[in-house]
A protein has these predicted regions:
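C-terminal regulatory/effector modules of DNA-binding transcriptional regulators
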Residues: 72, 79-80, 87-158
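A short beta-strand signature
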Residues: 44-58, 125-132
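Short, solvent-exposed beta-strand/turn "edge" segments of beta-rich domains on protein surfaces
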Residues: 39-45, 56, 117-121
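A short glycine-rich, His/Asp/Glu-containing loop-to-beta-strand
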Residues: 22-23, 50-51, 56-57, 61-66, ...
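HTH-adjacent hinge/linker in prokaryotic transcriptional regulators
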Residues: 1-45, 66, 74-100, 104, ...
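A short, well-structured catalytic beta-strand-centered motif of the EAL phosphodiesterase domain
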Residues: 41, 66-69, 143-146
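Broad gene-expression machinery/nucleic-acid interaction feature
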Residues: 24, 48-50, 64, 125-127, ...
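Bacterial carbohydrate/catabolite-sensing allosteric modules
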Residues: 19, 60, 137
Length: 158
C-alpha cells in the first residue's frame, strides 16, 4: 500500500455546484454503519438521518454520496437538501469547521458498475470518506464514490 497524508488548515467548507446536475436520491432514517456510530459516539441502534445524492453527467451518474448526519442536528427527512448540504448544516447551527478525509482508488466492483451504468472492464473508482465536525463536535460522515476516468479532485485549503 502506498499512502500519502497531509495536514493543513482552511476557513470553513462550502459546496460549489458549478452547474452540476446533483440530485437527491433519498432522505431517510436508518441505523448507522459501525464506523459512523463510533464517530458520532452513539449506539448502532440509534437511527440517524441518511442523505443519498448523486451527480449526473449526460444523464449518467458519475458520483454517489451517502451522508449520515448526527442526530443532534435539527434536520429531518422533510428537510430540503437540494442545495448545499453545508449551507443547510450552517443554517441549523452547525457550520463545518474541520474536515478529515481518506481517499482511495480501486477497480470497480460489479455492484459499482451497475450503480454507475458502466459495462467496461477494469474501470477505476475513487472512494472518499469524509468526516466533518463543528467546533470538535462530529456532525456529518460521508462515503463518496467517483467514476475515476478523467476525474480530477481539487482541494483548495485557505
Amino acid at each position: 500500500t502506498v499512502a500519502t497524508s497531509f495536514q493543513s488548515s482552511f476557513n470553513g467548507v462550502k459546496e460549489t455546484n458549478n452547474n452540476n446536475d446533483r440530485r437527491v436520491i433519498g432522505v431517510e432514517y436508518t441505523t448507522p454503519p459501525i464506523d459512523v456510530a463510533y464517530y458520532f459516539g452513539i449506539s448502532v441502534n440509534v437511527p440517524v438521518l441518511k442523505l443519498t445524492r448523486q451527480t449526473y453527467v449526460d444523464e449518467k451518474p458519475v458520483t454517489h454520496y451517502e451522508t449520515y448526519i448526527n442526530p443532534i442536528v435539527p434536520v429531518d427527512e422533510k428537510t430540503d437538501f437540494s442545495g448545499s448540504m453545508y449551507a443547510k448544516l450552517e443554517q441549523a447551527g452547525y457550520p463545518i469547521t474541520h474536515v478529515k478525509e481518506k481517499i482511495t482508488a480501486t477497480l470497480m466492483s460489479t455492484k459499482q458498475k451497475e450503480l454507475f451504468q458502466i459495462a467496461k472492464k477494469n474501470e477505476a473508482i475513487m472512494n472518499r470518506t469524509r468526516m466533518g465536525s463543528s467546533n470538535d463536535l462530529p456532525i456529518e460522515y460521508t462515503y463518496s464514490q467517483y467514476v475515476a476516468n478523467g476525474y480530477e479532485l481539487v482541494i483548495d485549503l485557505k
